Amino acid sequence: VMLSGHTDVVPVSGQDWDTDPFSLTESSDKLYGRGSADMKGFIALVLSRVPEMVSTELTKPIHLAFSYDEEIGCVGVQRMLDLLEHQPIKPSCCIIGEPTGMEVVIGHKGKLATRVKVRGHACHSGQSPLGVNAIDFASELIVYIRKLAHEKSQNGPFDKDYEVPYTTLHTGVVGGGTALNIVPNLCQFDFEIRHLYEEDPQHLLDQIENFARDHLENEMHLIDSDTGFDFETLATYPGLLTDPGIEFVTYVKGLLDNNAHSKVIFGSEGGLFQKRLGIPTLVCGPGNIDQAHKANEYISLEQLEKGGNFLDCLLESLVLS
């Protein structure tokens, strides 16, 4: 049984905290601090039980898989996957302790994050028709991305188990230009695709790149052939979808005494364990994702107790009788 989590956290810059985000503070039955909800509470619970794991004779070994740089696109776990891929024996199942309120999660969307650099042709703004405005052409591509997002919202495919039941596209960061009287020769923006498990995000990315090449660059090259678009993948990970009827899911539900399961809006490393290694994976951990990444992030003592009880039940179920 593999217990998995990530050790990194998101930054606190620009957030107004009431306490030191990197000193754990207890107040009103809650523990405040960066990463308390996402997902260091789970890691702390697991590590606190390592002595018992080591001293107890188990029917199956317990593997601890803690990664880094998950928050920037599941980057650090790649080295772990490379290592596990060549092992003769792999874990039979994986529990990722992201905050789910200690409920079983069997699915989440995948993600493809892309950076687009638009190369224009600068000139004085009084001669703007002689230049190639990188911001203008970036804007046209952003509008096209928004159009694709609208088409997905109308035509699907759909998965009713999600709060947003279709693949989404979203532009989140834009930058460009140096002065109002200069036609900008550079604009950069980042967009992401959050896709359903069964959808291939590369198909959408191909549509976006083809629109840029076939429609926008042709117009740009009438003035300067060195202008154009550059696409860079920032991060990508697959979606997760685990059959709720398999023995592993039933086993975990039994330990929790809760037969419910769901799909969530946030991602995890679970799809990578499932897709690359073929390890049945689910997400289940203490805390609430609504508290993650915010100022005054916290986890309740009640959730930690539930998480600890679950790990104790897991250990007890694996004890060699």
Describe the predicted segments one by one.
Residues V1, K30, H63, S92-I95, ...:
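Structural motif
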Residues V12-E26, P91, I106-K117, L282:
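Acidic-glycine-rich active-site phosphate/pyrophosphate-binding loop
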Residues M2-H63:
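Active-site metal-coordination/substrate-binding segment of hydrolases
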Residues L31-I43, P51, E71, V132-I135, ...:
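Short, conserved micro-motifs enriched in small and acidic residues
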Residues S27-D29, R49-H63, Q87-K90, I145-N155, ...:
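Phosphate-handling active-site elements
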Residues M39-A113:
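Acidic/histidine-rich catalytic neighborhood of metal-dependent amide-processing enzymes
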Residues S4-H6, A65-S67, C94-G97, K117-R119, ...:
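Short beta-strand segments
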Residues R115-S321:
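Metal-dependent amide/peptide-bond hydrolase catalytic core
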